[in-house]
């Protein structure tokens, strides 16, 4: 019998979230971001749920080739652009758009011999200080690209560093507009947080938006807003079963380091999921779970293959009971709305992005899709 743990990918939830992004940024085209193997969900698994996207944005040439082989004929954008000159031949062969964020990438284009001119997104650094030309160097980069016969179309982009917080996007927007107002080309600025919080403004959403984490049902500005606030549905759920029950007396301890001490008689469920499955090792006592659809909590430290949960006040919970680590229970008859991955991530001092992308290969995955 397989170990009783399972991840579920819900394509209807993915379609719903994509529709929410389109509604939040009316008239804009959508790059669905599928980097990091679609945030841990699996490129092959999610592609059918993203057919309504206008383009796919990712990092790796190998991933671009995979989605072409899977039948995607729409635009594909390489978010970090080319790393070597020979990558440009792949871009031509696979008909890829690619980001240009430094002079070295323009140098590569200038010496590249191609029969098909390239479509590029020229990136400005408006304060994130990761990739992109400084505002002062941006026009010279655009002018140089515009003079190359290897380049057919230049679009303009940046990435907001504070769209999810109080600082907001106004300073970055002002910089971008000041240095691009008379340059031709489509624009792309908005990540998930900017789409949900700011994209009703046509000057912000411009031509293309690039939602990532929100597509998969996580709130980009948690804890300020929950996924439910943005009407997002969890795409990934992680469920496992209780494989043993322990009865504790006052003073008994649980797990490595005796980190949890019972202050009353307790029943503890041992769950077939640990940090080797992708559950966060640093999740403390009190991290929320659902047991047979009823909210409870973890107790003690997370082990490699197991976690322990409090079932003292759940008299029907026993060996075989389903524990929802994040997302929704597998049985729709269960009473709970589940556990947001953002709640678990916040308790563990991380973000939903990390939990999704860290799902271990040993966890079996089931794809749900309604006709």
Across the structure, where does each feature detected by a protein language model lie?
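A charged N-terminal "starter" segment
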Residues: 1-97, 152, 364-371
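Active-site loop/helix belt of alpha/beta enzymes
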Residues: 2-3, 24, 36-48, 92-94, ...
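Residue-level signal for inorganic ion chemistry
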Residues: 14, 67, 156, 242, ...
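Conserved beta-strand positions in the central sheet of alpha/beta enzyme cores
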Residues: 57-58, 77-80, 99-100, 157, ...
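Short, acidic/turn-prone active-site loops that include or flank metal/cofactor-
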Residues: 61-62, 80-84, 103-106, 125-126, ...
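A structural signal for short, hydrophobic beta-strand segments that form beta-sheets
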Residues: 80, 153, 242, 298-299
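C-terminal accessory subdomain/extension
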Residues: 247-371
């Amino acid at each position: 019998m397989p170990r009783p743990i399972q991840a579920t990918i819900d394509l209807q939830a993915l379609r719903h979230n994509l529709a929410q992004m389109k509604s939040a940024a009316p008239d804009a085209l959508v790059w669905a971001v599928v980097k990091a193997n679609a945030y841990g969900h699996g490129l092959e698994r999610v592609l059918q749920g993203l057919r309504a996207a206008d383009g796919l944005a990712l990092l790796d040439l190998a991933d671009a080739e995979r989605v072409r082989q899977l039948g995607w004929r729409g635009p594909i954008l390489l978010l970090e652009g080319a790393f070597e000159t020979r990558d440009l031949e792949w871009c031509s062969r696979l008909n890829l758009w690619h980001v240009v964020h430094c002079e070295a990438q323009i140098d590569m284009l200038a010496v590249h011999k191609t029969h098909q001119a390239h479509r590029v997104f020229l990136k400005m650094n408006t304060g994130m200080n990761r990739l992109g030309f400084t505002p002062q160097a941006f026009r010279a980069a655009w002018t140089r690209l515009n003079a190359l016969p290897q380049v057919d179309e230049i679009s303009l982009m940046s990435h907001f560093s504070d769209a999810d917080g109080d600082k907001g996007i106004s300073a970055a927007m002002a910089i971008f507009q000041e240095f691009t107002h008379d340059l031709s080309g489509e624009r792309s600025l908005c990540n998930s947080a900017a789409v949900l919080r700011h994209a009703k403004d046509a000057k912000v959403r411009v031509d293309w938006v690039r939602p990532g984490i929100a597509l998969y049902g996580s709130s980009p500005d948690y804890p300020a807003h929950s996924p439910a606030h943005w009407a997002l549905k969890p795409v990934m759920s992680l469920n496992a079963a209780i494989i043993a029950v322990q009865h504790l007396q006052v003073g008994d301890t649980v797990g490595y380091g005796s980190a949890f001490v019972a202050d009353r008689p307790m029943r503890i469920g041992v769950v077939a999921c640990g940090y080797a499955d992708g559950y966060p090792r640093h999740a403390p006592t009190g991290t929320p779970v659902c047991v047979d659809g009823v909210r409870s909590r973890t107790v003690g430290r997370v082990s490699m293959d197991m976690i322990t949960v409090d079932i003292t006040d759940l008299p029907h919970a026993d060996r075989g009971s389903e524990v929802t680590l994040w997302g929704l229970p597998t049985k729709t008859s269960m009473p709970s709305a589940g556990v947001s991955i953002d709640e678990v991530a916040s308790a563990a001092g991380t973000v939903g992005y990390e939990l999704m992308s860290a799902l271990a290969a040993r966890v079996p995955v089931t794809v749900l899709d309604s006709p």
